[in-house]
Amino acid sequence: MSRHRFNNVQIKALPGGLMAHHEPDADGGQPGSQKLPMWPSERIPPGGAGAFHSAKVQYSKETADLIRLLVKESKMSMLVRKQIDESLRNGEPLPLPEPPRPNTNNDPDKETLAILDRARNAKRKNLRQIEASGAYKQSYYRPPADNRMHGEKAKSQLQFTMAGTHLPDPAIKPRRRPREEQLVTEEDLINELLDQINERAEWLTEMESMGQGKKYRPEIRDQIAERLRRIQALESKMKMKSNGGFRFVD
């Protein structure tokens, strides 16, 4: 089996314009190289199914220029600017602003109260503002042109497949790629703890809006304070590693 892991059935089932073809050498001899079949979809990126990938949008030139001008005038980091520019080029939604990182140098109990105050005082749009922004207006969907096979060609291909003409060899089994183990770093653990803190602060704000905040407030405060202490321990561990220090435990 070839290293490209394409059998005859998969290559023959592709449309005519996507078939792998050989290019003759300059001296007119045997074909030199074999081109791989192109990705058959223009809307769905390689490496995933359409159900898990949102449809791409085409930003107008005026919208893209306005967003780039606002980014240029604002005080954003280079990482956020690159993310916004990549979203404009790929037609993806703009990245959401991240909540402020808690100050682990302060007392965990005081920092917990500050986090809950920020979540409680966050401004939210009411129904009238959401309707005025046009969020509930439905736009007419026009499916884009694709490169699928024509009806007669697809029928004939289905007939050949059902007749068993292009069935694959059962002795040939595709190779499975070995799973790559992802190493979890201290920064990943800190980001996960920050997400848990923000989720609990927002949930407590919703409970307070329904009049149930007093019932869950002590428990949520303890959970947020405990996660802040874990973040402090992870940050001190990262600082010790960066300084080249080691700690021995009996």
Swiss-Prot record:
Q: What is this protein called?
A: UPF0193 protein EVG1 homolog
Q: Which family does it belong to?
A: Belongs to the UPF0193 (EVG1) family.
InterPro entries xref list: UPF0193
Region annotation Disordered: residue ranges? 86-110
> PANTHER family under this entry?
UPF0193 PROTEIN EVG1
Q: What domain of life?
A: Eukaryota
Source organism (scientific name):
Drosophila melanogaster
